[in-house]
Amino acid sequence: MPRPLVLMILDGWGINPDPSNNAVAIGRTPAMDRLMAEYPSVEMETSGMAVGLPDGQMGNSEVGHLNIGAGRVVYQDLTRITKSIDDGDFFTNPVLLDCMARVKAAGGRLHLGGLLSDGGVHSHNTHLYALIELARRQGVKDVFVHAFLDGRDTPPSSGAGYLAELEAEIGRIGFGRVATVMGRYWAMDRDNRWERVERAYNTIVKGEGAHRPDSAAAIEASYSAGVTDEFVEPAVIAPNGSPLGLLADGDGFICFNFRSDRAREITRALTDPAFAGFDRSPWPRLASYVCLTEYDATFPLPVAYPPESLANILGQVVSRAGLRQLRIAETEKYAHVTFFFNGGVEEPFPGEERILIPSPKEVATYDQKPEMSAPLVTDALLKRIDEGVDDVVVVNFANADMVGHTGILDAAVRAIETVDECVGRVAATVLEKGGALIITADHGNAEMMVDETGGPHTAHTNERVPLILVDDSRKGARLRPGTLADIAPTMLGLLGIPQPPEMTGKSLLVATE
């Protein structure tokens, strides 16, 4: 058994045959080039049905880590919720119906807040439309939408189109109004930057921010100032000079994001009695607050689509075998190598340790520091490998994804080169210790930095990703192409641990010499 066996996830590092505007191709990557030439490698599918998403839907970090850790294709929340809308179950969901009943009993209004996007990473606009239709059917007095604009998982200036589509759907349904508009930068932080969340809160609750006559005027004003979707300043829709729909006592709120990590902070701010992130007076006492999926197991809030438990995932199987495992990443991807990798469970398994390296807070966006905390992650990992404590290690390097999201090619190239340097350092140490290294990615991003219009490409891609098996005892091994679900079975095979029946992925190892 190789010790340690290190799974290195290069977040956002995809394979694009077109080298133009491709940070992965442009960057100098001597370590990855050498390892690819010397060791068995293969291309992996990370999008669509291969990871439990709808056909053609790009993968993302949450989905990728869930599939890798589970060793099976995990039916994603997006697919699950969309299917329930199609078959009608959505409209009889007891948690959603209870929320609306409570709002009606309190004489309140219903607020729907979340990412207005069809990017499918954090939310889907069709889920919002279904909620508006459900509220109409249930006879709710008023529905107000708090639209967080995307620009990361969608083109950076696509928000105007999504708002126009929302207004058209509201017109078709004959119900609902847009109350506030803001970029996701404010409402969907995940790194305790409470000053951002405070701006979102103050807009939704207090009506602070620019007052605009309608949603189109709000986005047009932002574009005129050169500010694209992600960073749109919080604006209040006030057609007659006073805000249409501020959140107040007796109202209900449904957060329609299905991905948890960027929905937690705004949810805490709106619901937690002990919240101390900023002064939020007034704090509305709501009739109901519903999370579309489980954002945090400790939140005492109703969940419309609770998690489906996953048995015998990689971390659990490794733990039961009596092996020690380490999860290590910087803040931006720490939840992915822990919570998501463990099937949506926060608690570590016995024998599982975790190291969190803080992401840089001194910059507003990571194009200003493309190396992020990757060198510090590497230093901490090498120290740990030298100590010889762990049997299995999962490490994530966030750079290709987080800097790729900025749409700035030069910065993404520097990010790629930083990660390559870290790969080289880790590979040398692991091999020196007699260990093995699986290098892969959860989805693509930095390999496409310009979109078809010639503008910045800030979203994930549907491209395949590499997988390299760096193991001196298996240089002659043959690998087959696969999906992320096949990585855990491959690792168990290398560790000599039987694969449990719940893991339906297949080992990538075809034959060894």
From Swiss-Prot:
CDD domains, A to Z: iPGM
The record's comment on protein family reads: Belongs to the BPG-independent phosphoglycerate mutase family.
Q: In which pathway does it act?
A: Carbohydrate degradation; glycolysis; pyruvate from D-glyceraldehyde 3-phosphate: step 3/5
Protein name (record): 2,3-bisphosphoglycerate-independent phosphoglycerate mutase
For the ligand (substrate), the binding residues are 122, 152-153, 184, 190, 259-262, 333
Q: What are the alphabetically sorted keywords of the record?
A: Glycolysis, Isomerase, Manganese, Metal-binding
Provide the Gene Ontology terms for cellular component: cytosol
Q: Gene for this protein? A: gpmI
Cofactors per UniProt? Mn(2+)
GO MF annotations in UniProt:
manganese ion binding; phosphoglycerate mutase activity
Report the superkingdom from the record.
Answer: Bacteria
Record keywords: Nucleotidyltransferase included? Answer: no
The record's annotation in Pfam families points to: iPGM_N, Metalloenzyme
Q: Can you quote the record's cofactor note?
A: Binds 2 manganese ions per subunit.
Q: How does it assemble?
A: Monomer.
> What's an example GO BP annotation here?
glucose catabolic process
Binding-site list for Mn(2+) 1 = 401, 405, 460
UniProt-listed Gene3D superfamilies: Alkaline Phosphatase, subunit A, BPG-independent phosphoglycerate mutase, domain B
